[in-house]
Amino acid sequence: MTVASYSMVLCGSSDDHRYRGRIEKVKFGVPINEAFAHDIPATLLMLLLKVNKDGPAKKDIWRAPGNQAQVRKLSQVMQHGRLVNIENFTVYTAASVIKKFLSKLPGGIFGRDNEETLFNSASTGMDIEKQRQVFYRIFGSLPVASQHLLVLLFGTFRVVADSSDGHTNAMNPNAIAISVAPSLFHTCIHDGRTARVEDLQRFKLASNIVCSIICSFGDTKLFPRECYEYYARYTGRTLRIDENRMFTFHNPSSELFY
């Protein structure tokens, strides 16, 4: 199942029989191991692939909200496990539903303790290489489904950021980080009360961490190779490694000119 096949979530694919003949319910607001019994549910995966494919050309993607009525409708359809034509929803709605799913994960995708570890690594003046090592260790401790979700997310953030100069999306790594950090790092959210100085500091740290991961995407010391391979396979790209030991991703059409 690749980016080219997301339009109607129907009956599976040649490489993953678990999607055949049924649609898994997407559970909002439950722990990740309950939400992802096997791996990323089909509909959520298709939303990620839609944003990965169409998002780079869309202005303010990840920052501009989707239509709230459509966000509620799509969320309900996903929770009931009903068939859905993804093409009936805008890429902004897709991105908003993804952020909603992340924001409702109890403790966040990383967990409170891991968030604190990442904040400490970013706030103590630790050099960027050691910060990557901390992230790599935390990433490796997460369930495989969480790893798959994160590598698809950050790969998508990166392709959007890479297009910020050539398109009108205006979403460079810092702009994306500011827009998505609260969905990924729940301890930087101030729970509706008046924001304190420390809340703002944590939000800034969270944004800096997300921005750094986006900019480092492809680094061999950030995500394991098998996760980069997962990202390449599901987005329909070819994985290569360059002279700087960085993984790079190429669309099939660009292979003719490589």
Language model features: what each stretch is:
Residues 1-38, 46, 123, 133-145, ...:
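Intrinsically disordered, low-complexity regulatory regions in eukaryotic signaling/scaffold proteins
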Residues 2-129, 215-218, 225, 229:
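Catalytic and GAP-homology cores of small GTPase regulators
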Residues 100-108, 159, 163, 186:
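Amphipathic alpha-helical interaction surfaces
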Residues 107, 144-147:
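Alpha-helix boundary/capping and short turn/kink residues
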Residues 148-152:
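Alpha-helical solenoid repeats of the armadillo/HEAT superfamily
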Residues 154-157:
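HEAT-repeat alpha-solenoid elements in large eukaryotic scaffold proteins
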